[in-house]
């Protein structure tokens, strides 16, 4: 995850026709700070609901959103300007 980005793609996409619910367990490391959490995303054609439950050592300056285009839901991120990029490690669970 690059520093100081707005709505940049994480590379994670979901076909709205076949995937309805997703849980993403993740870890973010940015500089000397770390964050561990779970994203829960409910997907419906052109709509979604997202929650982000996490703990972090200090503010990592990362937030998530979902966008829709052509039947695909895309997980995106925004980062603040801390001067450091962040690593994003994740495990995806599809719940249909």
Language-model features, listed with the residues they occupy:
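Low-complexity intrinsically disordered segments
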Residues: 55-96
């Amino acid at each position: 995850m690059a520093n100081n980005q707005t709505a940049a793609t994480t590379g994670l996409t979901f076909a709205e026709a076949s995937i309805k619910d997703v849980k993403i367990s993740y870890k973010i490391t940015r500089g000397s700070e770390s964050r561990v959490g779970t994203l829960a995303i409910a997907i419906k054609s052109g709509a979604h609901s997202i929650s982000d439950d996490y703990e972090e050592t200090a503010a990592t300056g990362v937030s998530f959103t979902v966008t829709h285009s052509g039947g695909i839901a895309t997980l995106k991120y925004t980062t603040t300007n801390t001067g450091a990029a962040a690593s994003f490690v994740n495990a995806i669970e599809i719940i249909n």
